[in-house]
Amino acid sequence: MRRITLLTNPDKCNLNCPLCFLNQRGFSRCVLGVGEMAFETARTAIEKYAAERNASGKRVLREVIPSTMGEPLLYSHFEDLLSLCRSMELPLNLTTNGTFPGKWGCEAGMELLLRSCSDIKVSCLASEQFDGWKANVEKLLDVRQKLMADAAQGGDAANSMLNARALGIATVSLQVTLHKKNVDKAAELVSWASSVGINRIKWNPVVLLSTASQQLREMYALDDAQIESLRQELRNGALSASNVKHEGSLFFNNGKVFCAVGGKCESCPFADEVWVWPDGHEDHCPDPERRWSKVHT
């Protein structure tokens, strides 16, 4: 497997975002009830896939992703996970809600994350719940700029920014859930991202589960014209910045259904990835409707 995602703490979060798949299910936020992943479960999964080699003897596993449901920095064993991956020279691909709780909000904590991760994605889904996320991103980027300058041995950190990974320092991305309330702010977001040094924006049109309420749909659902308009503006450069990459499900061939490839597993861009649940069982399909709409209801 190229990447593994550990669902370390899907029920543990410090925010309550309305578009979270657990909230869309129409039940209380913590009904998933699967608990936290024991560290030994995480270790076993990582060591299992880290042992895989390709025909030339090179390790196949490139990175580990801690929970993308819940806030991974609240995982009780996050520091242990970080230490294990560092010892195995496996970078983490981190997605956080931007609150940077506890030690992770201080300069030393951010420096450790930047040295240990391949990419740090800050989800803009939390923007309605937490208005301090931009300030935290700017602080993270300030810490990275200092690291880049040191790594470049006094060279021009700005010119080295695009080579962050080559210097062993994480890139910083935004993960944007596009919906009715924020689609008209895309240009403003791109401008800010470019000015502060964001490397990439992942644009993902909102996915509403079949269990989502009508009220939620009326508040957040996008129509096809809005999605297509933004897609074209980003593709033709009208809404782009030369120093920011644009990726995400907005650019998938078929973004109108839950599965972006229409259920054709042989075309799935995630075919060489696996998701490990807290109890250790494995899941190979990322379709949110299948995964979240009926689990433990």
Where are these regions (language model features)?
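Radical SAM enzyme [4Fe-4S]-AdoMet core and its adjacent flexible, acidic
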Residues: 23, 28-33, 37-40, 83, ...
